[in-house]
Amino acid sequence: MKSLHCVGLYLLSLLCEFTEAKKHCWYFEGLYPTYYICRAYEDCCGSRCCVRALSIQRLWYFWFLLMMGVLFCCGAGFFIRRRMYPPLLVDEPTFNVSYTRQPAGPPPGPQHPGMPYYSDPGGAMGNPVTPSFHVQPSPQGNPPFPPPPSYCNTPPPPYEQVVKSCK
């Protein structure tokens, strides 16, 4: 009786081993299902076809690493190329802008009546009629840019005057 149990267990284990080694697959052909069998290392793919489970298409991490490697190589090549062959600098005309402060105190010469002097936070006084910038002449004789509008040459009115004019 004991040997019968051992033989039964052995046959049952063989049956389990053989059924695990195969995959039972099916698909619909018309209205009825059609069954077929694939090996254990294959996957069912549809109409009676089996594909290997570790095919290159299913390895998403392989494709991800491949794309990251390609992007890294392109980026490294771009930066190496920029380092070895820097872009040529185009000679642009020099544009000199100089800022000069007016001397402290009222300027000598005639003063215009009704034109008050405004002081900047540093305490220097300036004449609103004289421009606070100096354009350096170009070699051709005419300036490279037109002068700024006249309202740019005068400082803004004091706060008290603006408040009084609004009331």
Curated annotation (Swiss-Prot):
<feature type="topological domain" description="Cytoplasmic">
    <location>
        <begin position="81"/>
        <end position="167"/>
    </location>
</feature>
<protein>
    <recommendedName>
        <fullName>WW domain binding protein VOPP1</fullName>
    </recommendedName>
</protein>
<feature type="transmembrane region" description="Helical">
    <location>
        <begin position="60"/>
        <end position="80"/>
    </location>
</feature>
<feature type="compositionally biased region" description="Pro residues">
    <location>
        <begin position="140"/>
        <end position="159"/>
    </location>
</feature>
<keyword id="KW-0732">Signal</keyword>
<dbReference type="InterPro" id="IPR026229">
    <property type="entry name" value="VOPP1"/>
</dbReference>
<dbReference type="GO" id="GO:0031090">
    <property type="term" value="C:organelle membrane"/>
</dbReference>
<keyword id="KW-0812">Transmembrane</keyword>
<feature type="signal peptide">
    <location>
        <begin position="1"/>
        <end position="21"/>
    </location>
</feature>
<comment type="function">
    <text>May be involved in the transcriptional activity of NFKB1. May regulate WWOX role as tumor suppressor.</text>
</comment>
<feature type="compositionally biased region" description="Pro residues">
    <location>
        <begin position="104"/>
        <end position="113"/>
    </location>
</feature>
<keyword id="KW-0472">Membrane</keyword>
<feature type="topological domain" description="Extracellular">
    <location>
        <begin position="22"/>
        <end position="59"/>
    </location>
</feature>
<dbReference type="GO" id="GO:0030659">
    <property type="term" value="C:cytoplasmic vesicle membrane"/>
</dbReference>
<keyword id="KW-0805">Transcription regulation</keyword>
<keyword id="KW-0968">Cytoplasmic vesicle</keyword>
<keyword id="KW-1133">Transmembrane helix</keyword>
<dbReference type="GO" id="GO:0005765">
    <property type="term" value="C:lysosomal membrane"/>
</dbReference>
<keyword id="KW-0967">Endosome</keyword>
<keyword id="KW-0458">Lysosome</keyword>
<dbReference type="GO" id="GO:0031902">
    <property type="term" value="C:late endosome membrane"/>
</dbReference>
<feature type="region of interest" description="Disordered">
    <location>
        <begin position="101"/>
        <end position="167"/>
    </location>
</feature>
<keyword id="KW-0804">Transcription</keyword>
<comment type="similarity">
    <text>Belongs to the VOPP1/ECOP family.</text>
</comment>
